Amino acid sequence: MTIFGIDISNNNGPDIDLAQVAREGFRFVFAKVSEGDRFADHTWPAYRDAAHANGLLVAGYHYLRGDADVEGQADLYIAHLGDAATMVDFEADSGDLSTFWAFVNAVNARGRQINLSYLPRWYWQRIGCPDVSTVPGLIQSSYVYGSAPAAALYPGDDSPFWTGFGGKNVDILQFTDAAVVAGHRVDANAFLGTLDQLRALLGLAPSTTQGVLMALTDAQQADLYEKVQEIWGQLRGPDGQGWPQLGRNAQGQNMTLVDAVAKLQQDLLSAPKATS
């Protein structure tokens, strides 16, 4: 199966409705935490908490800068990350692979394991095509043209965009920077596998939800529950005690909608037939 997610930061503004993102079928959010050794993204805490509240898997990323102190960058990142999976954004101006590993090791030394690495093929080529076989959770980016809902833009599970490099398979593909999601244009990602496989990639325990509902987010399950309750109420009446306006049955109880329809059918069938 293919699972879709989004990638956001302060560049997208603070007002993306993650409840709507979940309703549109997305299952994960990657959002910016920090950059270099000074910048903390002000949108991160709210997006992190909203992702959790709406059943979306969430990872927070640090944009690694090759011109800033690695230890200071790790300190800043960990200070602002909180309860989320970890991700390194390693691209333009991030330095070479030695800088990448220095940051990964610095984060690991602070008690967190890096789960994901955004390292697009073009940047890998720019730094000399090194071996990246041990890079955790490779996210590669190649963009399709146009702007539309993410599923309409997705190039497919067999797209060459998924081709690995540097001795590493691609774990997640960022395939557009112009997906229309919850009324915003954002980066969209795809993961090939189950939700539990994605959770494992993010260093999270398997879901405890079993059966058909495990394909739904917490927000979608809540929405489904509300709809079922509404349907039950319309059929059975308030508290399941029938509707006073539909009349009473032979036992003096308020009739439900089904009772009333059955009574109406019985009355119609027993009514005298018109003669010509």
Residue ranges and their predicted role:
Residues 1-19, 134-214:
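Functionally critical loop-and-helix segments that line ligand-binding/catalytic clefts
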Residues 1-117, 135:
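Substrate-binding cleft of extracellular glycoside hydrolase catalytic domains
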Residues 36, 66, 122-123, 180:
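Positions that flank functional sites
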Residues 50, 102, 128-132, 156-161:
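Short, aromatic/basic amphipathic alpha-helical patches
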Residues 70-74, 195, 225-228:
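Short, amphipathic alpha-helical "lid/cap" segments that border enzyme active or binding sites
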Residues 71, 97, 127-129, 151:
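Short, well-ordered secondary-structure micro-motifs
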Residues 112-125, 140:
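Aromatic-lined carbohydrate-recognition surfaces of secreted/lumenal glycan-active proteins
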Residues 209-275:
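Heptad-repeat coiled-coil amphipathic alpha-helices that mediate oligomerization/assembly
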